[in-house]
Amino acid sequence: MIKFFLMVNKQGQTRLSKYYEHVDINKRTLLETEVIKSCLSRSNEQCSFIEYKDFKLIYRQYAALFIVVGVNDTENEMAIYEFIHNFVEVLDEYFSRVSELDIMFNLDKVHIILDEMVLNGCIVETNRARILAPLLILDKMSES
């Protein structure tokens, strides 16, 4: 099960955070700081899976952005690693080569995409067309 999903830039600034189980706001800040430090301090040659406290961190770097997913011990690391890539492919398709600015200025749409893919910490959809369908309908409605 996914515990949290973070998008962070190289400077350590959180661009998106989504928690699938309750974490107190003060603990979130500390958790994010430690998780970001753990991922940013690693070299490209090191593994993208980290054992951290009572869960695992799986991360991928895309240009200046890191996507970090915290999961429980029973989750398949490779499945989450590929899920991260699928998420970025969906963003690329919707935004035509997604950038950090796209995420910052369209955070609501990024949350919609993530919510279509993950429900209560479980991956429920990976098909790009079905993930983007609600957003495309919203876009058509806003044009009218």
From Swiss-Prot:
The keyword S-adenosyl-L-methionine does not apply. Widely expressed. It is a peripheral membrane protein. Adaptor protein complex 4 (AP-4) is a heterotetramer composed of two large adaptins (epsilon-type subunit AP4E1 and beta-type subunit AP4B1), a medium adaptin (mu-type subunit AP4M1) and a small adaptin (sigma-type AP4S1). Component of the adaptor protein complex 4 (AP-4). Adaptor protein complexes are vesicle coat components involved both in vesicle formation and cargo selection. They control the vesicular transport of proteins in different trafficking pathways. AP-4 forms a non clathrin-associated coat on vesicles departing the trans-Golgi network (TGN) and may be involved in the targeting of proteins from the trans-Golgi network (TGN) to the endosomal-lysosomal system. One of its GO terms (biological process) is protein localization. SUPFAM superfamilies: SNARE-like (SSF64356). Keywords: Golgi apparatus, Hereditary spastic paraplegia, Membrane, Neurodegeneration, Protein transport, Transport. It is linked to Spastic paraplegia 52, autosomal recessive: A form of spastic paraplegia, a neurodegenerative disorder characterized by a slow, gradual, progressive weakness and spasticity of the lower limbs. SPG52 is characterized by neonatal hypotonia that progresses to hypertonia and spasticity, and severe intellectual disability with poor or absent speech development. Some patients may have seizures. Signal peptide: none annotated. Coiled coil: none annotated. This is AP-4 complex subunit sigma-1. It comes from the Eukaryota. It comes from Homo sapiens. Belongs to the adaptor complexes small subunit family. It is found in: Golgi apparatus, trans-Golgi network membrane. One of its GO terms (cellular component) is endosome lumen.
